[in-house]
A protein has these predicted regions:
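Conserved cytosolic headpiece of P-type ATPases
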Residues: 1-731, 741-742, 755, 766, ...
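Generic alpha-helical transmembrane segments
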Residues: 712, 757, 779-793
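Alpha-helix capping/termination and helix-coil
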Residues: 607, 664, 759-771, 788-798
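Membrane-water interface at loop-to-transmembrane-helix junctions
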Residues: 736-755, 775-779
Length: 875
């Protein structure tokens, strides 16, 4: 609807809606309410809590465990079944709770709607619920009102609207009633339209409603939110791939063992099946799902302490693999407040702080800036109130101890010509030393054409073409730096009288004041750190291309050879053309929510893990579409927070870099935990296969494997997950998301380490089997495998030797080892537990000494190999 109305005149717009300035009749309003429905945002289809809970069991590893648990139950091994199901249900509950907290986007969008609206109905002004507004209604807007529907401005009285929640830009937008004759106009340039969810900050207007509910720009965003599908996180993708491959390997091994048990050892089918199930339980890292959840939860807590709040546990490691950050400008990379910068007066271009109140021209420039504005300073709260541009002028006065209130008290306003987007001027009349003086601020091109003189320290001089050219040159120079420039002039009147537009001529030009929404100081370093870590930062903004490029250059985002593209230019590109130019585009200006999703999609097509940061409603769909959406916690709308995976509590772009380091650390710790669990399980598989091939007694009882996998292993694995971040993580490039979590080097380490542990375990088995005592052999193998895996926890802390890492850097690894040893000793020497865990009655401390020596051998070998590797790397 918007595109059809901005080109029409007010009268044509009324005719198109079959409406009049008197408003709709009550009967017609009811008819249209039935036709168009309530002025509300529709809700997306939601999953029930039960659906969410059941979806937690779709993971392949979980399904395999369920099958193993069911077979165990039918085979009489009830204890294993109960423990496995308890672990799976706990994981499902945790996943459901996280999901329920994250899905609230549409509720926040609905809450943004104003509860009431002032409309004309049958020539009478009435106030109605915003849900009852229909297309064709005449809405009356004034300062402080929330716009409740999209509409065409019919009458404009200096209306200024803050559309930052839609466009992302904090500067108020001046509205007009004039038609716009253009084929394609960006949302931020539709000066004769107002949009649902925006706020009126100044003036008033009469508006014809052209769109309600889902037919508004806000509704389009809600629709995008419903349609946008979130991709799985890199960790989810890696674990899915890992689970599928591990399942195939386990099923193949179990099939081989099942066959060997029948044909090699002569075991019955049921016994062989139970043995194969026991092997499956030994092979599957039952604790992995719980440990990954715990490691992610601990990562979440650490990030929260660093002001990065993660909503989805599975996304905690995602920042570590991000290769592209698509960042909103206003409030994210910049401070979201206009700040005075350079001043031009008396032929000199100065920094704002270099302004001299001794200089008559500069003093008059400051006086004009404070008098010809309406912003005020709130001393109690330490903030200024008003239009952001005028707030910057108040800030300039503060730098020199000049209070705008005292200025205005000394020189009260005697008359005013309010700002108008057509004139691009604002004028106020004051008494200056007994002389009625008109101060005017506005666009330099307008004021230059209306100025006949220029003020210098010598007095007024004629405004010659050369002087106009010089002022225009300075303005262009400031604009190219991304600065917004305001011009100031004055005119002395003969007497105090009502002002007319004719008075805005014959000015004496005073000077220029420029301002900017400055970059956050920490954002500059954060962008540089991101680049060092192999991460590309892209600026996406609703601002003008020149301004955005200048800010991006200051931040280090935009470099020589880079491109800046507007939303209109982006519309003219095919996906193929965009893909070709994508690596060179660093700035996207005047973009819509659809553009943002298209940009994210383009980078994802190239195999990148994409992060999108933002704080406005307009960012929400792209935040949800991105691999990881980052919302601002202070300035961000509830919509953006609910759509994002991560919220920055301090709105600090630099916090993202900390999240990257933490994400990489979390992924490394999960990978190390997987190495620990699988190498230990591999050792158990090697032992069982060896025993099957040689027709030896079963080396482990099912209760042994359950003890190792669910109790002893979990403690060191959790400790590995608490390993502090290594130095130099930010110097590494983002990992390839296509790389499996189990790559060849890791598989080789798992296989080699598992073989070492299996060898010492089977040596212990033979030591116990010397007298043909199968129970003693099983006890020796069980105790050795358990202790060897406890020692192995130190090997899996990282790639460096523990002699370089130092045990003190992770006290939890020591505590986990000691706790595991205590549990093992209790099982081996406590009478009641000995019988429960089928420990040989003859097992004593002499046997324990043999076990300790054997169990430590794999760790000794692995640490010696690491020392050699460290020496070769020059560490």
């Amino acid at each position: 609807m918007t595109q059809a109305y901005y080109r029409k005149t007010p009268q044509q717009a009324l005719e198109a809606q079959n409406a009049s300035a008197e408003g709709l009749s009550a009967q017609e309003a009811r008819r249209r309410a039935e036709q168009y429905g309530p002025n509300k945002l529709s809700e997306g289809k939601k999953k029930s809590t039960l659906q969410v809970f059941l979806e937690q069991f779709k993971d392949l590893m979980v399904l395999i465990l369920i099958i193993a648990a069911v077979i165990s139950a039918f085979s009489g091994n009830v204890e294993s079944t109960i423990v496995i199901f308890a672990v799976l249900v706990l994981n499902a509950i945790l996943g459901t709770v996280q999901y329920e907290k994250a899905e609230k986007s549409l509720e926040s969008l609905k809450a943004m709607a104003s509860p009431t609206a002032k409309v004309m109905r049958g020539g009478v002004r009435v106030e109605i619920p915003s849900a009852d507004v229909v297309p064709g209604d005449i809405v009356l807007l004034e300062a402080g009102d929330m716009v409740v529907a999209d509409g065409r401005v019919l009458e404009n009285f200096s209306l200024k609207v803050n559309e930052s929640s839609l466009t992302g830009e904090s500067e108020g937008v001046d509205k007009t009633a004039e038609a716009i004759d253009a084929d394609q106009v960006a949302l931020g340039d539709l000066k004769n339209m107002v949009f649902s969810g925006s706020l009126v900050t100044y003036g008033r207007a009469t508006v014809l409603v052209t769109g309600t509910g889902m037919d508004t720009e806000l509704g389009k965003i809600a629709a995008l939110m419903n349609q946008t599908q979130q991709r799985k996180t890199p960790l989810q993708q890696s674990l899915d791939s890992f689970s599928a491959k591990l399942a195939m390997v386990i099923m193949a091994i179990c099939a081989v063992v099942f066959a060997l048990s029948i044909f090699r050892t002569g075991m019955g089918i049921l016994d062989s099946l139970m043995f194969a199930v026991a092997l499956a339980v030994a092979a599957i890292p039952e604790a992995l799902s719980s440990i990954v959840t715990i490691v992610l939860a601990m990562g979440t807590q650490k990030m929260a302490r660093q002001n990065a709040i993660m909503k989805d546990l599975k996304a905690v490691e995602s920042p570590g693999s991000v290769s592209v950050i698509c960042s909103d400008k206003t409030g994210t990379l910049t401070q979201n407040k206009m700040t005075p910068q350079k001043v031009y007066a008396d032929g000199s271009l100065l920094e704002g702080e270099d302004l001299s109140l001794v200089n008559d021209v500069q003093r008059l420039l400051l006086k004009a800036a404070l008098l010809a504005s309406d912003a005020t300073n709130n001393e109690k709260e330490g903030t200024a109130i008003g239009d952001p541009t005028e707030v910057a002028l108040v800030m300039l006065g503060e730098k020199f101890g000049v209070d705008e209130e005292s200025y205005r008290a000394q020189h009260p306003r005697l008359g005013e010509l309010a700002f108008d987007s057509d004139r691009k001027l604002m004028s106020t009349l004051h008494d200056i030393d007994g002389v009625p003086t008109l101060f005017t601020k506005g666009a330099i091109d307008v004021l230059l054409n209306r100025s006949t003189h220029l003020l210098t320290r010598e007095g007024k001089v004629e405004m010659t073409p050369e002087r106009r050219e010089e002022l225009a040159r300075v303005n262009m120079e400031l604009s190219m730096e991304g600065l917004r420039v305001l011009a100031f002039a004055y005119k002395e009147l003969d007497a105090v009288r009502p002002l007319t537009l004719e008075d805005e001529n014959g000015f004496t030009f005073i000077g220029l004041i420029s301002m900017i929404d400055p970059p956050r100081p920490e954002a500059v370093q954060a962008v540089a750190d991101a680049k060092r870590g192999g991460i590309r930062t892209i600026m996406i903004t609703g601002d003008h291309k020149v301004t955005a490029s200048a800010i991006a250059r200051q931040l280090g985002i935009f470099r020589d050879g880079d491109e800046a593209v507007s939303g209109v230019e982006l519309d003219g590109m095919t996906d193929t053309e965009l893909d070709e130019r994508l690596p060179h585009i660093s700035v996207y200006a005047r973009v819509s929510p659809e553009h943002k999703i298209r940009i994210v999609n383009a980078w994802q097509r190239r195999g990148n893990i994409v992060s999108m940061t933002g704080d406005g409603v307009n960012d929400a769909p792209a935040l949800k579409k991105a691999d990881i959406g980052v919302a601002m916690g202070i300035t961000g709308t509830e919509v953006s927070k609910d759509a994002a995976s991560m919220i920055l509590a301090d709105d600090n772009f630099a916090t993202i870099v900390k999240a990257v380091v933490n994400g990489r650390s979390v992924y490394a710790n999960i990978k190390n935990a997987i190495q620990f669990l699988l190498s230990g399980n591999t050792a158990g598989i090697f032992c069982v296969l060896y025993a099957s091939l040689l027709a030896l007694p079963v080396p482990f009882q099912p209760v042994h494997l359950l003890f190792i996998n669910l109790l002893t292993d979990s403690l060191p694995a959790i400790a590995i997950g608490m390993e502090p971040a290594r130095k130099g993580l930010l110097d590494q490039k983002p990992r390839d998301p296509r790389e499996p979590i189990l790559n060849r080097p890791l598989l080789a380490r798992i296989g080699g380490q598992g073989l070492l542990i299996a060898i010492v375990t089977m040596i212990a088995f033979y030591l116990g089997y010397q007298g043909g005592d199968a129970v003693m052999a099983s006890t020796m193998a069980f105790a050795t495998l358990t202790l060897a895996r406890l020692f192995h926890g130190f090997n899996c802390r990282g790639s460096e030797s523990i002699f370089r890492l130092k045990l003190s850097t992770n006290k939890y690894s020591v505590l986990a080892f000691l706790a595991g040893v205590v549990l093992l000793l209790l099982v081996l020497f406590t009478p009641g537990l000995k019988s429960l865990f089928m420990v040989a009655p003859a097992f004593g401390f002499a046997n324990l000494g043999e076990i300790v020596l054997l169990a430590f051998l794999p760790t000794l070998v692995i640490q010696l190999v690491k020392l050699v590797c460290d020496a070769r790397r020059g560490k």
